[in-house]
Amino acid sequence: MSKLHVDIAKACLKEKSKEACGFILGSEVIPLKNISEEPETSFVIDARDYLTYLPDIVYHSHPIGDNGFSEHDLLVASNLRLIFYVYVVEEDRLERFSTETGTTIFQDVLGR
């Protein structure tokens, strides 16, 4: 498993029962505050963070359940034309989506 994938998973685990979110800049994971009114089931990144970092890659987590990308996640990723990752905590699974390559799945990211 790549160091980047492991770093994304570890950043997501720090948020416990809330959806973690942030950006990837180069090989660096940048955790951000989830400003959603319902952070246990959704994530929202402050628009000012997008302007500050100008990211190409966004990550977030699904702390409960075994679902990967939601339809909403894919719609946002497609509209923003960014690469999105979702870490499915209970399954130790990382999914990557881009409009060019579709979805790629990485199992057992942390080997737990």
Regions found by a protein language model. Name each.
Residues 1-55, 64-112:
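Conserved beta-strand-loop surface patch within small alpha/beta domains used
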Residues 57-59:
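Conserved catalytic cores of phosphodiester-cleaving nucleases, focusing on short active-site segments
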